[in-house]
Amino acid sequence: MDNPSVTLIQRQGYQFEHHYAPGIPVLLADEPAPFGTGLGPDPVELLASAVGNCLSASLWFACQKYKDDPSPLRTEVKATVGRNDKGRNRVQGLAVDLHLGKPAAELGHIQRVLDTFEDYCTVTQSVAPAVPVTLRVLDSSGAVLKG
């Protein structure tokens, strides 16, 4: 990965277009009411998406390394937002549930994957020192494998 960049251009009010590399669709972000109109994800949702996507991709990569196929993956991220001691809103935590599309018994190297994949998630490992991230990994039967 080189040095990724994004250019934000204000459309109106709290709406910002996120322009990535050529060929990547523009993403519209917006604040929810009463500030914005809620036409796109807000910055907290984008942070949650980045953490969830990175963990999902990291788990997928680790499984592929061992020729395991956990698909289809489904990841839910819930952000906790509250006020700090100065009364400012802050993301106080991110709770991630990563659901495998298969039972653990069908994934021959799942324990090795679970022991290592988190360490390779660039976004989560960068965010976690400031925002606590809790992670659970569940198989398709709902059994908790991690967390």
Predicted regions span which residues?
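Extended beta-strand/beta-hairpin segments
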Residues: M1-S49, A57-G147
